[in-house]
């Protein structure tokens, strides 16, 4: 294992993983020569989904609070080597939209449009998540993620909350063993 610039890299038998120390997530993951995660498709916290008719009471608030456009920044990190070849990467991550936005519906098409208001940058008082994230990398290449996520507006109803990432197309059939 080693740190190279803003990346922490580990290589083992049949696996290679890199973490982005500025975003607090995996930036590359290769098992047995197959790239599963590449830069741009890394796991990231998301709290937005496309609104539907039943969301009329809350959908504008999702956009106004920036849930559709979260950017992630590491506030602190620590890397700890543990017995048995395990390594834990601890991150405190702030997830927040860069600016205000609004949602409108085009009546003729029935489509929603999000308009970004770059003249109103978000600050500390605006909606954001703080995540305490722990990635554990095992010597056999297994990787686990634990996170504790909170926000400065705990009463805001969220559409969803979880981590998403994009797998290569050849992995279209898979089994998910998590909650939700």
What are the residue ranges of the model-derived segments?
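Beta-strand/loop-rich accessory regions of lumenal/periplasmic or secreted enzymes
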Residues: 1-180
């Amino acid at each position: 294992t080693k740190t190279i610039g803003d990346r922490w890299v580990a290589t083992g038998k049949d696996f290679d993983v890199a973490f982005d120390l500025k975003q607090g997530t995996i930036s590359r993951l290769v098992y047995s020569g197959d790239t599963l995660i590449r830069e741009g498709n890394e796991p990231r916290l998301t709290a937005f989904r496309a609104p539907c008719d039943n969301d009329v009471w809350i959908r504008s608030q999702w956009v106004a609070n920036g849930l559709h456009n979260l950017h992630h920044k590491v506030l602190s990190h620590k890397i700890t080597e543990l017995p048995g070849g395990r390594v834990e990467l601890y991150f405190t991550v702030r997830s927040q939209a860069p600016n205000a936005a609004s949602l409108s519906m085009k009546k003729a098409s029935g489509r929603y449009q999000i308009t970004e208001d770059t003249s109103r940058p978000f600050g500390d008082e605006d909606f954001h998540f703080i995540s305490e994230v722990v990635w554990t990398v095992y010597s056999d290449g297994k990787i686990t993620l634990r996170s504790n996520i909170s926000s400065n507006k705990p009463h805001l109803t969220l559409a969803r909350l979880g981590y998403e990432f994009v797998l290569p197309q050849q992995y279209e059939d898979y089994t998910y063993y998590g909650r939700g």
